Amino acid sequence: SFARSQGLLAMEAMWTRYLPQSTILRALLESGDLGQPELFAAQFCTDNRAVKRLWTTVGGGTLFDMGIYTLAMAQQILGNPSTISSSGIVGAHGIEQELSVSLGYESGARAHLLISGIATLPQVASCSFEKAQVSLHAPFFVPSAITIGTKDFYPDETTWKDTTGIQGHEGLAYQATWFADYVAQGLVESPVHPHEDVVATLRVMEEILESLSTT
């Protein structure tokens, strides 16, 4: 609100939403060709025990550093959940090490997220829609690829891959480009990731931690 009152652009550094595969996904969602989303699944599981910032009592934990990417992708596809439940492993000083999160939506759609800072699994995100299935290749939160397929057991598939040579965290450059364009337009928030989305995701994460503490 302060940035808005000053006429300044404020954006969260949720760079995954500005990657090419996310732009393609957004276009598919807006077209309506996929139908309504049914079931979303994503996992961000990497043995990050050597990354000290994750395990500090101030700002530590896997949810805010890693899990936010799964939640932001779920939000892009499904919106904000109406029900939240979680379970997991809590380590020293009450810092979450691993979480399994289930989200329910008023539409009837479901999302299941797996986040771990102690185990490693492929970092993929997929969603079943009424008319198709969509998969974001690992690691889904950096420049990668997107596959759209039929819902058959052996689906017909079409894949787009980022061939720019931009890899890993170099993908931050995509959001920087969008940011520069928004500044030139005089915007105060991102149309593809508005402030209300940022705040909503933070609230969901707080509820996840509350749910975890009571299980």
Regions from the PLM with identified roles:
Residues P20, I24-A27, M73, S100, ...:
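Alpha-helical elements of Rossmann-like donor-binding domains used by nucleotide-donor carbohydrate transfer enzymes
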Residues E106, W178-T215:
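C-terminal helix-rich "cap/oligomerization" subdomain common to oxidoreductases
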